[in-house]
């Protein structure tokens, strides 16, 4: 039987009894301790100090469980009117084996729960971390806590894994970006080729339009030359027609408006019927001179010639003067019907009038 000595104040006996009652079948020990003779009390010199008592209480296995019970119990059980304080006196308490075994029986459930806490604190590593640790030739325990070296190794491995993941992510983003750029380059290259084809087609159309424009200009120039040549031809024809028409119109106008001094006096001889029937008029006198004579000088010459032969002459007179006539009138002679009259006059040896004189009328006529 083990004896524990405690220095207690008389007011602390109630507290100790309460603690023993709450702890189970430990109530007999305080009774025995109280009923024990007072010879077990030690002198003050041999009593423990306050610090020793605290160390002793902290070494006891039961106080944590007892304190947990008090903390989890109803607060009404803790509230008392008593005030407890440790005194300077120390008492010794003897605890038998039965009470100690009961305390151990109550503490066993708490000791069973400790392995569960250790399982929760087990170190869990990923496959990547295990592979890197194996690659570096390091091993970590499967349970916590770890030493500082092991923690540094674990941090270094996890840092490498994070850097690797970030590098992979950056490479993935870069690959996506480069792929987007390549797709854009291919797209813009296709568009550039299409635009080049369009530009080439437009250049060909421009050249064809320029060729058509040159042809149209040549056609316009040709039509302008043809129009100018046709207009010149028309103008030449009109001018020639005017040149041909104006003189004819001028000649007809001038013929109608000749002055009177240029008119030729034409005379026509007409013989009246005589009383002598055998005497006939010369046929030349019976025939009238045509009115519309184109040459009035010729007509005047013929008339004068006829008059010259018909004029009576005085006897023993000189022969008449013969005037020179133009070449056109050199062959002109009076008609043959006048020759008998002239012969008759000469036969009578003188220009004597016949018994039946013939009257001659001179009639003036304008011919223009």
UniProtKB/Swiss-Prot annotation:
Pfam families per the UniProt record, alphabetical: bZIP_1
Motif (HCFC1-binding-motif (HBM)): 81-84
Topology class, membrane: Single-pass type II membrane protein
Keyword Membrane: yes
Alphabetic keyword roster: Activator, Chemotaxis, Cytoplasm, DNA-binding, Endoplasmic reticulum, Glycoprotein, Golgi apparatus, Membrane, Nucleus, Repressor, Signal-anchor, Transcription, Transcription regulation, Transmembrane, Transmembrane helix, Unfolded protein response
Spans within the Cytoplasmic topological domain: 1-229
Transcription activation (acidic) as annotated region, ranges: 1-95
Disulphide bond pairs: none
Subcellular location: Endoplasmic reticulum membrane; Golgi apparatus; Nucleus; Cytoplasm
Motif LXXLL motif 2 per record, residues: 57-61
Chain ranges passing through the membrane: 230-250
bZIP domain mapped to chain residues: 153-216
Motif segment (LXXLL motif 1): 16-20
Major subcellular location class: endoplasmic reticulum
PTMs per UniProt: First proteolytically cleaved by site-1 protease (S1P) that generates membrane-associated N-terminus and a luminal C-terminus forms. The membrane-associated N-terminus form is further proteolytically processed probably by the site-2 protease (S2P) through a regulated intramembrane proteolysis (RIP), releasing the transcriptional active processed cyclic AMP-responsive element-binding protein 3 form, which is transported to the nucleus. The proteolytic cleavage is strongly induced during dendritic cell (DC) maturation and inhibited by DCSTAMP. That form is rapidly degraded. N-glycosylated.
Record: glycosylation sites: 344
Tissue and organ expression note: Expressed in trigeminal ganglia (at protein level).
GO biological process, alphabetically ordered: chemotaxis; establishment of viral latency; induction of positive chemotaxis; positive regulation of deacetylase activity; positive regulation of defense response to virus by host; positive regulation of monocyte chemotaxis; positive regulation of transcription by RNA polymerase II; regulation of apoptotic process
Entry keyword annotation includes Isomerase: no
Region (Leucine-zipper): 186-193
Residues in compartment: Lumenal: 251-368
Family annotation (InterPro entries): bZIP, bZIP_sf, CREB_ATF_subfamily
The family this protein is said to belong to: Belongs to the bZIP family. ATF subfamily.
Protein role: Endoplasmic reticulum (ER)-bound sequence-specific transcription factor that directly binds DNA and activates transcription. Plays a role in the unfolded protein response (UPR), promoting cell survival versus ER stress-induced apoptotic cell death. Also involved in cell proliferation, migration and differentiation, tumor suppression and inflammatory gene expression. Acts as a positive regulator of LKN-1/CCL15-induced chemotaxis signaling of leukocyte cell migration. Associates with chromatin to the HERPUD1 promoter. Also induces transcriptional activation of chemokine receptors.
Protein name (record): Cyclic AMP-responsive element-binding protein 3
Organism annotation: Bos taurus
Lineage: Eukaryota, Metazoa, Chordata, Craniata, Vertebrata
Gene: CREB3
């Amino acid at each position: 039987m083990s004896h524990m000595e405690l220095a207690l104040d008389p007011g602390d006996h109630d507290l100790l009894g309460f603690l023993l009652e709450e702890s189970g079948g430990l109530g007999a020990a305080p009774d025995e301790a109280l009923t024990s003779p007072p010879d077990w009390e030690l002198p003050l010199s041999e009593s423990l100090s306050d610090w020793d008592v605290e160390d002793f209480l902290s070494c006891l296995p039961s106080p944590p469980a007892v304190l947990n019970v008090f903390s989890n119990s109803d607060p009404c059980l803790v509230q008392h009117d008593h005030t407890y304080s440790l005194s300077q006196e120390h008492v010794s308490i003897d605890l038998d084996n039965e009470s100690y075994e009961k305390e151990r029986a109550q503490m066993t459930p708490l000791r069973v729960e400790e392995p569960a806490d250790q399982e929760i604190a087990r170190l869990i590593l990923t496959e990547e971390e295990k592979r890197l640790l194996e690659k570096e030739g390091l091993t970590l325990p499967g349970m916590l806590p770890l030493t500082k070296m092991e923690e540094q190794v674990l941090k270094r491995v996890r840092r490498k894994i994070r850097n690797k993941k970030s590098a992979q992510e950056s490479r993935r983003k870069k690959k996506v970006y480069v792929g987007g750029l390549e797709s854009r380059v291919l797209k813009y290259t296709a568009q550039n080729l299409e635009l080049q084809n369009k530009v080439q087609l437009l250049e060909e159309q421009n050249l064809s339009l320029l060729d058509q424009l040159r042809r149209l200009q040549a056609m316009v120039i040709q039509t302008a030359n043809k129009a100018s040549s046709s207009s010149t031809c028309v103008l030449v024809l009109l001018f020639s027609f005017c040149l041909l028409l104006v003189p004819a119109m001028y000649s007809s106008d001038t013929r109608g408006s000749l002055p009177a001094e240029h008119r030729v006096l034409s005379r026509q001889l007409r013989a009246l019927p005589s009383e002598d029937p055998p005497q006939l008029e010369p046929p030349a006198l019976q025939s009238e001179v045509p009115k519309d004579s184109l040459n009035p000088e010729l007509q005047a010459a013929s008339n004068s010639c006829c008059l010259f032969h018909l004029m009576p002459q005085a006897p023993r007179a000189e022969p008449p003067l013969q005037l020179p006539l133009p070449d056109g009138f050199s062959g002109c002679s009076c008609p043959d019907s006048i020759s008998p009259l002239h012969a008759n006059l000469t036969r009578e040896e003188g220009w004597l009038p016949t018994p039946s004189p013939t009257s001659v009328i001179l009639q003036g006529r304008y011919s223009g």
